[in-house]
Amino acid sequence: MLLAAGCGDETGPSADEPGGDATSSSSPSTATPEPVEPIDFGTEPRMRERYKKAALRAVDDKLITMVPTVLPDGWTARGGGYTADPQWWRMEFTAPTGDVVLDQLPGTSAEALADAELTPAADAELTPADDVDLTDWGTGTWSAWDHDGATVLAHDLKGSTVVLQGPDLETVRGLAESLLPAEDAAEQDG
């Protein structure tokens, strides 16, 4: 099952069991950009190394839950988590160029980003950038922003929004190109 490969094998009775820490020791051959504090949507879901059940629980709660079909080369999934109230699906990744975060929330990207605390710094804000066309990957056009030097992509789908954050457009786009709803990924062989 593809989702199991991407989400870890779960042997415990619930998706809320603690998982081990997953780390990556690979380092890029070029200078790593200065990390940027991601957009703060509130108290984030607790991250688990094994999160397949959490993803499917979010689906059961009618939140479309996006997961990567295959991670780009050199990437690792650090974990995922889901909170039912308020609904929030989150995954964290390490890419060769830096950390990448996927947040999925009910509503639109405009609502989610308007309600978010961007950073403690008063000068940090979202600056609109050119939209990103991912029609060839089945998800259409994504809105893009610059957030204090980092890239933010957002896409609205059926009552929820996916927000991706990472160090640069190429990195964040690489994740966006691999996304598939969890319920579809669970049905695929892999």
Specify the residue positions occupied by each region the protein language model found.
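Sec-dependent bacterial lipoprotein signal peptides
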Residues: 1-5
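Short, low-complexity, disordered segments immediately C-terminal to signal peptides
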Residues: 7-41
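A short, solvent-exposed beta-edge/loop patch
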Residues: 130-190
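Intrinsically disordered, low-complexity, compositionally biased regions/tails
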Residues: 12, 16, 23-24, 84, ...
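Short, solvent-exposed recognition patches
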Residues: 37-149
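Generic short alpha-helical hydrophobic face used as a protein-protein interaction/packing hotspot
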Residues: 11, 79-80, 183
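Compositionally biased non-globular segments, especially hydrophobic aliphatic-rich helices
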Residues: 14, 25-26, 117-127, 157, ...
